[in-house]
Amino acid sequence: IDPHGTARALMQADLQQDLRVDSGKPLVFHQLIQVADNRWYWYQRYHHLLVDGFSFPAITRQIANIYCAWLRGEPTPASPFTPFADVVEEYQQYRESEAWQRDAAFWAEQRRQLPPPASLSPAPLPGRSASADILRLKLEFTDGEFRQLATQLSGVQRTDLALALTALWLGRLCNRMDYAAGFIFMRRLGSAALTATGPVLNVLPLGIHIAAQETLPQLATRLAAQLKKMRRHQRYDAEQIVRDSGRAAGEEPLFGPVLNIKVFDYQLDIPGVQTQTHTLATGPVNDLELALFPDEHGDLSI
């Protein structure tokens, strides 16, 4: 009997169920699976209506904090999380603010300059709906190749380099030098959402232009500058960008593939316990999501 294989099969079987909101299945599910005397899998599954990628490690750390406090015989730590109602109230205030108007103007201009969306699928993008029926493939650089490349290009941030490589790769797959992709923003910094667990992420259109004469560091630096500018306006909903142009959301997709850089802190501080986080699934996908995982050792997986 392979206890690790059995545990992974249990988790995959759970993920492959009909887990839509109206399925009757629990929206939150935790399971401890013992595979050896001193080794366990702590399986966690949440519906995306409840959490996003930022929330997972935050909730896990709080559970670990409670566990450690109980081990020491201490009272249960107070919750560090902001009620989600505060996030909703803050967003409603934003909708009535000058910042909303500035963001609307910024995205209207971005929309005018945006190249057509790319897709690897022959099916048309309009009319598609996000699905949880997802084909997942994990790609990893071997033997520290990404770490070596990042060392050679020391003037470029690792996350910027990872994004530039992925943008080039996607352009090559689509045979496109100019295309629009989605980029996931957390929409939390400077907001009540920074200490809330509900889902607030926003997927916004990123125009990618690949210049034949440009070097990889130059592309990485330019994309980073684009994202920095977009980040100032990340609270504005992508659906609203489409509505502002007189179309219905979903009628005219702004992008196909979505790029997602995941740099969350997955480390848990539990005395006497070594932990490692494995991401088994993400939220629903409309076309293609490329999730980039730079790790603490300087390597990269997609």
Region annotations inferred by a language model:
Residues 38-39, 92-104, 132, 151-166, ...:
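His-Asp-centered acyl/peptidyl-transfer active-site segments
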Residues 45-47, 264, 295-297:
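C-terminal lobe/hinge of AMP-binding adenylation domains
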